UniProtKB/Swiss-Prot annotation:
InterPro entries: GoLoco_motif, Pcp2, TPR-like_helical_dom_sf. Residues 23-45, 63-85 form the GoLoco domain. The gene is PCP2. This is Purkinje cell protein 2 homolog. Residues 49-59, 107-117 have a biased composition (Polar residues). The modification Phosphoserine is found at S127. It comes from Homo sapiens (Human). Pfam families: GoLoco. Keywords: Phosphoprotein, Repeat. PROSITE patterns: GOLOCO.
Length: 136
C-alpha cells in the first residue's frame, strides 16, 4: 500500500516519464510535419542561368518619386508633432524677433537658446520649494 502512494507522489505515470516511446513518437511526428511546412514556405531567390537581375543602383523614376513623397510626408508629420518652447528656466531665446529661427527645409521654428546664468544650469535633485516643517 505504501509503495503505490510513493509512486503517485513522485508523479511516475505514463505521461510523466521523460523520453517515453509515445512522447518520442509524438515529437518526431511534430518535427517532421513542421519541417515539411517550413520547406514548403521557402523560396529560392537565385536567378536562373538565362535570367539576369536588374541592377539595384538604377532605381526607377517611379520609385524615386515615391521615396521623395514618403520623405516629405514623414517630415511634415514630424513637424506637426514638434513642440515650440517659449521659455525654459535659465535660458533666454535668441534669434529673430519672435525668438525662433526657421530651420532649413522645415516649416517649424527651432528656438535658439543661450544660458543666462551658468549657475542656473546646475540641476538640483529636488528644485521644488518645500513647505516649512515644524518640530513635534
Amino acid at each position: 500500500m505504501m509503495d503505490q502512494e510513493e509512486k503517485t507522489e513522485e508523479g511516475s505515470g505514463p505521461c510523466a516519464e521523460a523520453g517515453s516511446p509515445d512522447q518520442e513518437g509524438f515529437f518526431n511526428l511534430l518535427s517532421h510535419v513542421q519541417g515539411d511546412r517550413m520547406e514548403g514556405q521557402r523560396c529560392s531567390l537565385q536567378a536562373g542561368p538565362g535570367q539576369t537581375t536588374k541592377s539595384q543602383s538604377d532605381p526607377t523614376p517611379e520609385m524615386d518619386s515615391l521615396m521623395d513623397m514618403l520623405a516629405s510626408t514623414q517630415g511634415r508629420r514630424m513637424d506637426d508633432q514638434r513642440v515650440t518652447v517659449s521659455s525654459l528656466p535659465g535660458f533666454q531665446p535668441v534669434g529673430s524677433k519672435d525668438g525662433a529661427q526657421k530651420r532649413a527645409g522645415t516649416l517649424s521654428p527651432q528656438p535658439l537658446l543661450t544660458p543666462q546664468d551658468p549657475t542656473a544650469l546646475g540641476f538640483r535633485r529636488n528644485s521644488s520649494p518645500q513647505p516649512p516643517t515644524q518640530a513635534p
